[in-house]
Each structure stands twice: as structure tokens, then as C-alpha cells.
From Swiss-Prot:
Record GO cellular component, one term: extracellular region
Post-translational note: Mature BDNF is produced by proteolytic removal of the propeptide, catalyzed by a FURIN family member. In addition, the precursor form is proteolytically cleaved within the propeptide, but this is not an obligatory intermediate for the production of mature BDNF. Can be converted into mature BDNF by plasmin (PLG).
Cited InterPro entries: Brain-der_neurotrophic_factor, Cystine-knot_cytokine, Nerve_growth_factor-like, Nerve_growth_factor-rel, Nerve_growth_factor_CS
One Pfam family per UniProt: NGF
Record's protein name: Neurotrophic factor BDNF precursor form
Top-level taxonomy: Eukaryota, Metazoa, Chordata, Craniata, Vertebrata
Task performed by this protein: Important signaling molecule that activates signaling cascades downstream of NTRK2. During development, promotes the survival and differentiation of selected neuronal populations of the peripheral and central nervous systems. Participates in axonal growth, pathfinding and in the modulation of dendritic growth and morphology. Major regulator of synaptic transmission and plasticity at adult synapses in many regions of the CNS.
Naturally occurring in which organism (per UniProt): Macaca mulatta (Rhesus macaque)
SMART domains reported for this sequence: NGF (SM00140)
PANTHER family: BRAIN-DERIVED NEUROTROPHIC FACTOR (PTHR11589:SF3), NERVE GROWTH FACTOR NGF -RELATED (PTHR11589)
Family: Belongs to the NGF-beta family.
Length: 114
């Protein structure tokens, strides 16, 4: 909820949910070349290892947006809320067992398409 009185009552065109996802949850992803890579659970650092986390946002399947985008006139437009993806860097292993930092696709937003 917004604390600014001028913004009260504002609703997004599409409902979304965001959550932190670990590499253990993700397991595999698609890299920039379109290949499937294994997402490594831990990243080696000087004092041990750190877990990889990704902040993902996607359309909420339980939200209002099942019937189209909020605020779009259904008599004139056919609208749909869709999850879009962006690339982020992650420590991964490819099919040839090569480990390295690659850009992978993750869910990052929920947008309205007409």
C-alpha cells in the first residue's frame, strides 16, 4: 500500500508477484545463445561459498488479470498479461561441463499485451 495520499487507490494494469529464488530452485536456465545451462547453487569466494539468488517477478495467476489487463476496454481490445524476461549474470555450467559466468534469462516483470 502507498503511504503517499496522492497515490492511494492506484492499481497496476497487471497483477504480479515477486520472490527470491535460489539456484537450487532454478536448476537450469536458458543462456544468451539459447542453450540450456545448469545454474550452480554456490559461488566460490575468498572465504568460502555464497548461494546464488535471483529476484524474479511474474504475473500472478490468482490475480484479476486472468480476464485481461485492468483498465483495458474488453469490448474493443483483446488484452493479456504476460510475464517477460531479462538477462542477468549467473555462474553456470554448460553441456560440455565448462563453468563460467553467463547471462541467463529470468522472469522480471508482468506486462500488458494487446
Amino acid at each position: 500500500r502507498h503511504s503517499d495520499p496522492a497515490r492511494r487507490g492506484e492499481l497496476s494494469v497487471c497483477d504480479s508477484i515477486s520472490e527470491w529464488v535460489t539456484a537450487a530452485d532454478k536448476k537450469t536456465a536458458v543462456d544468451m545463445s539459447g542453450g540450456t545451462v545448469t545454474v550452480l547453487e554456490k559461488v566460490p569466494v575468498s572465504k568460502g561459498q555464497l548461494k546464488q539468488y535471483f529476484y524474479e517477478t511474474k504475473c500472478n495467476p490468482m490475480g484479476y488479470t486472468k480476464e485481461g489487463c485492468r483498465g483495458i476496454d474488453k469490448r474493443h481490445w483483446n488484452s493479456q498479461c504476460r510475464t517477460t524476461q531479462s538477462y542477468v549474470r549467473a555462474l553456470t555450467m554448460d553441456s560440455k561441463k565448462r563453468i563460467g559466468w553467463r547471462f541467463i534469462r529470468i522472469d522480471t516483470s508482468c506486462v500488458c499485451t494487446l
